[in-house]
């Protein structure tokens, strides 16, 4: 990651419009049970989610790349509960204490097969990108549709990037928007005008430096996706 940054001239570093989120996906034991121990199926689902997230964030001038995939095949490293406040805090503490020491990354997402309490399907801290503890989200894998999982993950990462839920004045070309307060039956791949403004306001005001540097191609573990030069590097 640092080498890739060093290989660019100062002018390239200044004028590169993109931010880069290096993400680790963590899959819990309930997911392993849900997919009958089929780790290849789980990996493929996670790779597709990462690639879909990257496509969604391109319009925000972001690249989202998977630099780590951890599957808790034997036992969970934290207690995953339906209580989202408890689980989010537990995952954040584990990320700060253990995961950061094992793998350099900017953001971590826990994907679980348990059913969160109430109607919640995702939960994250707001405005926390690059924080050593709070740059995390938790996601319930409730739908068999791969795109739905990616939309929820993009939504929760959006909260990490300082984006709040859309209101009636936000739009994204007539489609349902990613940061809507609830997921639509036909989930969209687009962020709203409000999301764009809030995200870049957060970046300008808080300067989360961990997303400034372009990762090395060798750090990216998700398979190439046609038309995406970063993933094919």
From Swiss-Prot:
Q: Which UniProt keywords apply?
A: Calcium, Complement system impairing toxin, Disulfide bond, Fibrinogenolytic toxin, Fibrinolytic toxin, Glycoprotein, Hemostasis impairing toxin, Hydrolase, Metal-binding, Metalloprotease, Protease, Secreted, Toxin, Zinc
Note how many cofactor molecules are bound and how: Binds 1 zinc ion per subunit.
Q: What EC identifiers does the entry list?
A: 3.4.24.-
Asked if the record carries the keyword GTP-binding, the reply is no
Q: How is its activity regulated?
A: Inhibited by PMSF and EDTA. Slightly inhibited by Cu(2+) and Zn(2+). Not inhibited by aprotinin, SBTI, Ca(2+), Mg(2+), Na(+) and K(+).
> Can you quote a single GO CC term?
plasma membrane
| Protein's name in the database | Zinc metalloproteinase recombinant fibrinogenase II
């Amino acid at each position: 990651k640092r080498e890739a940054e060093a290989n660019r001239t100062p002018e390239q570093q200044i004028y590169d419009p993109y931010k880069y989120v290096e993400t680790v996906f963590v899959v819990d034991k309930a997911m392993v049970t849900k997919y009958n121990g089929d780790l290849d199926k789980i990996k493929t689902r996670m790779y597709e989610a990462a690639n879909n997230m990257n496509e969604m964030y391109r319009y925000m001038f972001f690249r989202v790349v998977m630099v780590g995939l951890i599957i808790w095949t034997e036992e969970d490293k934290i207690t995953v509960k339906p209580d989202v406040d408890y689980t989010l805090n537990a995952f954040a503490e584990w990320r700060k204490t253990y995961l950061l020491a094992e793998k350099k990354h900017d953001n971590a997402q826990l994907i679980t097969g348990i059913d969160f309490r109430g109607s919640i399907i995702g939960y994250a801290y707001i405005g926390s990108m690059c924080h050593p503890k709070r740059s995390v989200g938790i996601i319930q894998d409730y739908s068999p549709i791969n795109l739905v999982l990616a939309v929820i993950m993009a939504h929760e990462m959006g909260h990490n990037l300082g984006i709040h839920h859309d209101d009636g004045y936000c739009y994204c070309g007539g489609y349902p928007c990613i940061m809507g307060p609830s997921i639509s039956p036909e989930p969209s791949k687009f962020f709203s005008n409000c999301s764009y403004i809030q995200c870049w306001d957060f970046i300008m005001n808080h300067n989360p430096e961990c997303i400034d540097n372009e990762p090395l191609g060798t750090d990216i573990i998700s398979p190439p996706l046609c038309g995406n030069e970063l993933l094919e590097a």
